[in-house]
Amino acid sequence: MGLFIKKPLADLMTEANDSGSKSLKRILGPWSLIALGVGVIIGAGLFSITGAVAAGYTGPAITLSFAIAALGCCFAGLCYAEFASMIPVAGSAYTYSYATMGELVAWIIGWDLVLEYCLAATTVSISWSRYLVVFLEGFGVHLPQALTACPWDGGIVNIPAFVIVVLMSILLIRGTEGSSIFNGIIVFLKVSVVLVFVVLGWKYIRMENYTPYIPTNTGTLGEFGFSGILRGAAIVFFAFLGFDAVSTAAQETKNPKRDMPIGILMSLVVCTILYMLFAHVMTGVVHYSAFAGQNGIAPVAIAIDHMGQMDASGVIRPDYPWMNRAIVIAILLGYCSVIMVTLLGQSRVFLSMSRDGLLPPLFSHIHEKFRTPARSNFLFMLLVGTLAAFVPASVAGEMCSIGTLFAFTLVCAGVLIVRKTMPDAPRSFKTPLVPFVPIAGIITCLVMMLFLPADTWIRLVLWMLIGLDIYVCYGIKHSKLEHMQKHRSGQTTLDMIGITLSVLCVITGLWHQQTVGWGESKVLLIISFVFAFTHLAFYLYRLGKQFTSLTR
């Protein structure tokens, strides 16, 4: 079968039903899964992008943007729910692809997920450090920049970012039950802050702030009007990402076939309702134009400052000034759960890949006492912690988004395939309106990917090249599906993929430089060229070697 050999569904179900001392402990129920999803979806995005999008693109109609973005995510969520009920294994999109599209595609998406979770945890850890600094400054405590920023941001080492990664990793190493309880408490607190904002702010809504609900387009595509709503949807779409991490906890769920679809879909529903209520109150309390030019959570502070009564001089005295600090606390708590869930997802994907032989056995070792992949968690603690301590957030930023969207695309495509190839396979949940829903999910994700900048594509291609190297040198030789074969078919295909990625590396490098200007820094262009030509030489050499052996 070569590169596209598929993992039999029977093998996956055997793996899913494993309950020995070296298996993951099943302790999660539907409420825990919903909390897991809400925990990873709601970060600072709700507080930081709502005002900016309303001011620049949508006006009060940002609620419609949230609804459209949620619908787009729902397409992928329904596909994930079907797979999670059909193949309740920890590997998420990696495992689903292995069963439907074969080993090579599974490796690509698994390697992509590792990038997604690693960079998400890194980026959020750095942001957590920044908000901690802001929070402590409110009490007169000033941490030195040398110890709260990386060398590229004017510091030496980001100690708070490293510490939060270590703390969340220790929680995960000691067991899913404890980390689940901790996550549940955090989710309760941050959802409470959002609801308090909505409830207290509702009585200060002024209907004139909703007029016009959809501001007239400025004449530029995407600035207000219907096109502005769509552009706003493309931006807030990324505030919903993360629900896919729920599917990585399948083997720690008591009844995964029933509970996984509930956890995935209900977490999306809960977050959509909270997002729309928050945006409705925020744009109702103060006119959306007041948010223009404000960064971070400043627009939320403006809304809170307008929650009060106007005195004789026409100045509004805020009734709830303490809410600004509560929002920062909610962000700090929210980031803790995001870091924890992304670290969990990362180790579970590596666990599945290692069990299939594509990665060393180290990553599939289960601690007999804690029943967790402790060694894998420890390794990622060091990796993510080091990145968070020494790498600027701007480097990691949008990479996690493109990784997630790529995974969504393949999962939606997988549903189309599995309906044809395994129509009778038992599944407790079926994606409705097939093929419309999967196709709509694919189109939505591809469109969102096109909105991402060129440097994001460069880093994705570079990461794929590194992943291909590991698969060529290790994975293809140790795969358990064809472990008896010394030489597997498909080597020429791998070489052609390597050559294609090398060419794409050059193209994306030139595209990025053209976008930012030829007078700007050429670091990414140089890196892409070095990667491209070294890999081009390597895979051309391999291809020539195979051709020579065939002609003898």
Features from the language model and the residues they span:
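Hydrophobic, membrane-embedded alpha-helices of multi-pass small-molecule transporters
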Residues: 28-47, 160-171, 201, 219-285, ...
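Hydrophobic alpha-helical segments and their helix-loop junctions in multi-pass secondary transporters
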Residues: 129-138, 188-217, 279-286, 413-425, ...
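Membrane-interface "cap" regions at the ends of multi-pass membrane proteins
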Residues: 1-49, 55-60, 74-78, 87-90, ...
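TM-loop-TM module centered on a large, flexible mid-protein loop between adjacent transmembrane helices
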Residues: 95-96, 102, 133-145, 216-219, ...
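Extracellular loop-to-transmembrane helix junctions
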Residues: 3, 25, 46-152, 270, ...
